[in-house]
């Protein structure tokens, strides 16, 4: 019986790989976070609004730079309408080229949610995730051709829970950053971000991660 079992294993090629558990994923994130300083990628975003049962989609490119917990990010949306989004410190800007208008928002204390909402998993250590979230493994799935472990994160902070119900991350079996994120709000809305053509720690100047605006742009501050 033992020889038959061995023969069957050899014929199949090898024993199946052990399942990627939470500790494995968090260890990879710890390792990557130690040297992480930025990433570029193609981005597709799906936004679901529960009250009207509506989905909207956008796609473009993203440049993200992290220094400690400081995030500088630029997103260039091409489809369906061109626009640019920039986030730096506690400020967010949205530029509409067809109107030559930039809207500037003061994120204030909500600026900390950028790390929780937009940049989670990019340079985040596994230790930080465990500190701020209850982390569970939800199985393995393939995203953009990459076998990935899906993690579910529930915020431990009551204040964060007011804004974010939970976050799902798809982490490739050979990487420490997500190829997909899904952020759920308490009311049933969600945001799905999927990434491709990712380049880790690109050799780019800091200016590449900042919003580029024409000198004659019209500024608006909707909060005032």
PLM-predicted stretches and their roles:
Residues 1-7:
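Bacterial N-terminal signal peptides that target proteins for export
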Residues 8-19:
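Hydrophobic h-region of N-terminal signal peptides that target proteins for export
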Residues 22-94:
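N-terminal mature ectodomain segment of secretory-pathway/periplasmic proteins
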Residues 53-59, 82-84, 100-102, 164-166, ...:
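Short, mixed charged/polar active-site loops
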Residues 93-121:
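Acidic/charged, solvent-exposed loop-and-adjacent secondary-structure segments enriched in E/D, K/R, S/T
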Residues 33, 113-130:
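Short, solvent-exposed helix-to-loop capping segments enriched in aromatics
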Residues 19-24, 103-105, 118, 122, ...:
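Gly/Pro-enriched, hydrophobic low-complexity segments
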